[in-house]
Structures are given as structure tokens and as C-alpha cells.
Amino acid sequence: YYEDVEGNGMIAKMLQKFYEAGEDSRKTTGTILQIAFLTFRYQQLKKAVMQENAVLDSSLESDFVMAYQLHQNGEIDDVDFNIYVTLSQEMQANVNGSPWNGLPDLAVYLQIDPDHEIDEIQHRGREMEDIRDKPELVSYYNRVNQAYREWSKGYTRSTLLTVNRDKYDFVNHPEDRNAVLDQIEQKLVDLGKLSPQRFAEIQQQRAVTE
């Protein structure tokens, strides 16, 4: 389950508004944008918890980190943030009784240097995120990066695997991608969620397709 910004017209338009005027536009659109992301993620999670071996590229908790840092910076006010928290908690509670529970067996945190992250954002090529047009976005990106670093230190809801994104370019280099997949699958073996035999089969299949 992927976060498809370009394929979701509603969120794409809201993101444009969110970015268009820096802090001012974050204050006017931050709450509704985060609720939109929360709703989209909840819809994905409702489907994922009914499946075995589902993988999501984000989570309700990850969305909460974004909303929390906007609130901490005064870009979401107390009333709106309390509404957001109530919605988030209700959504999580609604999936907790599902067959595979609403919490992941394993969460993966891609830790990345702030400057490297900005380079990746620029390479992604979304005009609304371009720091050449909006240099004030650098401080915003750095703030988000730090918020996730702090979140990772206190995360206890499931096992967390931290992957050094500065070391692995798994987008452009298959060997890096396989190294990261090996780490993830080995952790699943350690947790009893994947058998050693199946892990070996998966590694062999990847070797054949390289």
C-alpha cells in the first residue's frame, strides 16, 4: 500500500495549497490536509489488516508525527489538534480487533541526513516542494526530519528497524535494495514472522532476477 500523492487528486490539490505560501499556508491548510492524509491511511489500513503479509509505506502513527510537529510550531492550533488526536485514536481503535491487529509486526524507519533528504526531495521533482523557489522550506524540512528522529527514539508500539538511508541507495542500486530487504526479512525471522526456509527461498528468488 503506497502513498500515491499524484494519483489522489484531492490530496494533491491540498498539498499545493499547503506549500504555496510557507508558514501562512501551513496554518490555513495544515489541519484539513492532515485529516485528509489520516482518512486515506485509515482506508488503506482497514484493507491491510484483513490480509496476511501486508506492507504499508506509512501509518497512522507516522501521520501523527506530521500533525504533532505542525502543532508544536503553531501551525495547527490546540482545538484542531485535539480533534485530530481524537480522530486518530478512534481510527486506530477501530482496527485493533481485526484479524492481524492494527499494529505492524515490524516498523521500518528510514533515517536520513537532513541535507541528503533535501537533495532527494529536489530530485523527486515536485515543483511545490522546490527550495529554489521557496528557500524557507529548508527549515521546514529540517524540522520534519528532526521530528521523526525524536519519534524513533520513543517508539514502543512494535519492533522498530532503523535503516541508514545515507548508506543505501535502494532506489537506484539493486544490491543496496537487496541488502535492505535482507535486513527487514532477517528481523521478521527473528520475530518468528518468517521462517528461515522461506527467507532463504526469497533471497534465492531475488538473486535469480538480478
Predicted features, each with a name:
Residues 1, 54-56, 106-108, 161-163:
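Hydrophobic/aromatic beta-strand patches that form the interior of the parallel beta-sheet core
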Residues 9-14, 108, 170-175:
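Short, solvent-exposed polar/charged micro-motifs at secondary-structure junctions
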Residues 33, 38-79:
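A basic- and aromatic-enriched beta-loop-alpha substructure that forms the phosphate/nucleotide-
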Residues 1-34, 39-40, 67-69:
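Conserved substrate/cofactor phosphate-moiety recognition/catalytic segment
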Residues 46-49, 97-102, 153:
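Conserved catalytic network of the ASCE P-loop NTPase/AAA+ motor domain
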Residues 122-210:
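NTP-dependent small-molecule kinase module
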Residues 66-146:
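A glycine- and Lys/Arg-enriched "phosphate-lid" helix/loop adjacent to the NTP-binding pocket
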Residues 6-7, 60-62, 112-117, 167-169:
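Conserved nucleotide-binding/hydrolysis micro-motifs of P-loop NTPases
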